[in-house]
Design a protein with these regions (language model features):
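Conserved beta-strand scaffold positions in the cores of enzyme catalytic domains, especially
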Residues: 24-26, 81, 295, 370-372, ...
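A charged, well-structured terminal subsegment
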Residues: 20, 125, 467-493
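PAPS-dependent sulfotransferase catalytic core
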Residues: 447-466, 470, 499-515, 524
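Short beta-alpha junction loops
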Residues: 127, 162-164, 299-302, 452-453
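Short secondary-structure boundary/capping segments
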Residues: 137-139, 173-176, 310-313, 424-426, ...
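Active-site beta-strand->loop->alpha-helix modules in alpha/beta enzyme cores, enriched
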Residues: 31-33, 198-272, 276-442, 448, ...
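Conserved phosphate- and dinucleotide-binding cores of soluble alpha/beta proteins
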Residues: 2-193
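Acidic, Ser/Thr-rich peripheral helices and adjacent loops at domain boundaries
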Residues: 176-186, 313-327, 465-474
C-alpha cells in the first residue's frame, strides 16, 4: 500500500541503503483485531531475542510523539496499538489525500522498548518543530511530551537544523546561558527581546533593564543611551515607502539605492500566488512607482488544484463548446486524490496561470512581463518531486539574463511543508553563483521575502515596506484572484487559516511589533532580508 509506512520507509530509506530484506522488521498494519496483541508481544520478544537495539534513529511529531507514542503514553509502555492524535493525522493528510483517509490507529514500538536502546539519535528540521523541540529538551519530563522521556537516557543526541532549534534558549537568547560574541544582528536581537520582556520601547530601556535581564555584558563598551539609539536607528532605517529606491534622494541610510530611478525588477514566485501572498503590497508599490516589474512563476502549481475545481472548469467548457469528455469527467467526479493524468494536470496548470494573470493585471503589469517557467523538477504529477536538473537551472538562468534586473525578489520562506520553496531557492542560489560574474549582476540586489508560512524576525529585517489600510485591501483583493487556493486548499500546512488571513495577520503583527518598540504606527508591514552574493 503506497500510503503505508512500509512503503514510506522503503522509498525514503531502505531503497537507498544496503540492508537485507530479512533484516527489516516493521509491525504489521493489516491484522485482525484479535491478532494485534499477540503480534505486539512477539515483536518485543523478537527484539529481545536478537540482543536488543544497539542504535535507534527517531523523528519527532508536533505533538512530541516518538514512534506513534502520542501524548499521555506511559514511560514503561511496550509495542501496542494506539489511537492517533488529531494533529498527527492532520500532518499526515497530504500523504493520504485528506484527513478523512488517514487511519485513526497505528501499531507503535513502546517508550520502554525505545529507551532500552543503547544509542538514540533524534532528527528534527523545520520551523514547525521548534516549539516541541524546546519542550522536549528544556522542560521537565512530561508524559504529554513523550520525547521528553529521552532526557533520562544516558546516550541520546538531538540533531537539529537552524529552524527546528530556533526556540532553544541557547539559540533564541544565548545571553541567558553564557557570554556572547556580539555582532550587530545579535545585539539587535537582544535589545528587541529586552523590549518584549520589559514591555518598553527601545528608547525607554534603562541600565537596570539590561542588568536585571542578563544583558549587562552589552554595557561594557557602550552606554545604555548609545545602545538604544544605535538599535533604534538601525531598525528605523529599514523602513521605506520606496522599495525600488527613492529617486533623487540621498540614500546613505536607506535600504535601497536611489539610482537608477526606474529599475528592472524580477519577482520569483515558487507557486502561482506566492508573489501576492508574500509581497503583494510591495509588488503593488513597485508598479505604481514606475519600475519595470516582471514576475516569474517557477512552478505550475498544478497539483494544488483540487479535482472538484478542475471538474468545474471542464464542465463550463463542455457546456460552452458542446464537446464532452465523459471519461475525464468521470475520473474527476469519483476521485479525491492527486491524479497523475497529463490532461488533468495541464488543465489545472492553465487554471493557475489564468488566476495569476488576473492578479497581475489587477496590480498593473502587462501580460508580457509575466513568465510561467514550469520548472521540470515539479512536473511529476505527485507530491514527490524530481531532483532538480540542469534544465531547471538553465530556465532560471535564462530569465535572469534576459531581464538583467536591478532587483530580484526571491522566496526565502523555508517553512513550506512540501518543500517547493526550498528547492526553488536552492536552484536560484546555484544559478546566482554561475551568473554573479556577469557585468549586469554587479548592479543587482537580491531581496528575500517571507509571509506564506512564517515571517522574518525583527532583528533579521533589512527592508520594511509599510502599507496603508487601502493597500492592505488591495493586497487582499490580488490574493483573491487565486480562487482555487482560497478555500479547501490542497496543501494547507499546519495553519488552518486561509492564506490571505494568515499573511494579513503576520503583516499586522509585524506592524504592531514595530509600534511596540517605538516605531511609527502603520496598518501593516511587509519585510525583506537582503542576500549578499
Amino acid at each position: 500500500n503506497i500510503q503505508s509506512y512500509h512503503h514510506f520507509m522503503s522509498v525514503h530509506l531502505f531503497s537507498h541503503v544496503d540492508i537485507k530484506p530479512e533484516n527489516i522488521f516493521i509491525p504489521k498494519g493489516d491484522l485482525m483485531n484479535d491478532e494485534v496483541n499477540d503480534h505486539c508481544q512477539k515483536y518485543d520478544q523478537k527484539i529481545s531475542d536478537l540482543g536488543g537495539i544497539d542504535f535507534q534513529l527517531l523523528g519527532i511529531g508536533r505533538t512530541g510523539h516518538i514512534g506513534f507514542n502520542e501524548p499521555g503514553s506511559n514511560y514503561d509502555s511496550l509495542t501496542r496499538r494506539v489511537h492517533l492524535n488529531y494533529i498527527t493525522r492532520n500532518d499526515a493528510r497530504k500523504s493520504f489525500y485528506g484527513i478523512e483517509n488517514v487511519p485513526t490507529t497505528a501499531i507503535t514500538m513502546g517508550i520502554k522498548t525505545i529507551r532500552k536502546s543503547k544509542r538514540i539519535v533524534l532528527l528534527a528540521w523545520g520551523q514547525n518543530k521548534s516549539s516541541v523541540i524546546k519542550k522536549a529538551i528544556e522542560n521537565e519530563v512530561d508524559s504529554n511530551i513523550p520525547a521528553s522521556f529521552l532526557q533520562k537516557h544516558s546516550n541520546v543526541t538531538f540533531v537539529l537544523d537552524n529552524s527546528s532549534s530556533s526556540e532553544l534558549t541557547r539559540i533564541k537568547s544565548p545571553w541567558k546561558v553564557g557570554s556572547c560574541n556580539w555582532n550587530n544582528e545579535l545585539k539587535a536581537k537582544a535589545v528587541i527581546w529586552l523590549c518584549d520582556i520589559t514591555k518598553k520601547s527601545i528608547l525607554k530601556l534603562t541600565e537596570s533593564d539590561y542588568n536585571e535581564n542578563n544583558l549587562s555584558e552589552l554595557l561594557l563598551h557602550q552606554t545604555t543611551y548609545e545602545i538604544n539609539l544605535e538599535i533604534f536607528n538601525k531598525l528605523q532605517r529599514t523602513i521605506t515607502g520606496w522599495p525600488g529606491g527613492k529617486p533623487n534622494f540621498e540614500d546613505t541610510y536607506r535600504p535601497e539605492r536611489s539610482n537608477p530611478s526606474k529599475k528592472r525588477v524580477l519577482i520569483f514566485s515558487p507557486h502561482p500566488d506566492d508573489d501576492v501572498i508574500s509581497m503583494g503590497g510591495t509588488f503593488d508599490r513597485l508598479v505604481s512607482q514606475g519600475h519595470e516589474v516582471h514576475v516569474a512563476y517557477q512552478t505550475s502549481g498544478n497539483i494544488a488544484v483540487s479535482n472538484s475545481d478542475v471538474l468545474k472548469y471542464v464542465e463550463v467548457y463542455e457546456s460552452f463548446s458542446n464537446k464532452k469528455d465523459k471519461e475525464l469527467t468521470s475520473i474527476l467526479k469519483f476521485n479525491n486524490e492527486i491524479l497523475n493524468n497529463k490532461k488533468i494536470r495541464k488543465i489545472a496548470g492553465l487554471i493557475r496561470e489564468k488566476e495569476s494573470l488576473g492578479a497581475t493585471r489587477f496590480v498593473g503589469i502587462p501580460d508580457s512581463n509575466v513568465h510561467f517557467l514550469k520548472l521540470p523538477f515539479y512536473e511529476t504529477g505527485s507530491v514527490k518531486k524530481s531532483i532538480p536538473s540542469a534544465s531547471d537551472k538553465e530556465i532560471m538562468s535564462n530569465i535572469i539574463s534576459e531581464i538583467k534586473p536591478h532587483q530580484i525578489y526571491v522566496a526565502g520562506d523555508l517553512a513550506d511543508p512540501h518543500g517547493t520553496h526550498k528547492v526553488c531557492l536552492d536552484i536560484f542560489f546555484d544559478v546566482l553563483q554561475n551568473l554573479k560574474s556577469e557585468k549586469f549582476m554587479k548592479d543587482c540586489w537580491v531581496w528575500l521575502y517571507r509571509g506564506a508560512w512564517h515571517e522574518w524576525q525583527v532583528h533579521e529585517i533589512d527592508m520594511s515596506v509599510p502599507m496603508s489600510p487601502n493597500q492592505v485591501l488591495r493586497k487582499r483583493k490580488a490574493i483573491f484572484y487565486h480562487q482555487t487556493q482560497k478555500d479547501n486548499v490542497m496543501f494547507q500546512g499546519n495553519d488552518n487559516r486561509e492564506f490571505w488571513v494568515r499573511t494579513e495577520d503576520r503583516n499586522l503583527a509585524i506592524a504592531k511589533k514595530f509600534r511596540d518598540i517605538g516605531m511609527p504606527d502603520y496598518a501593516a508591514i511587509e519585510t525583506f532580508k537582503r542576500y549578499h552574493f
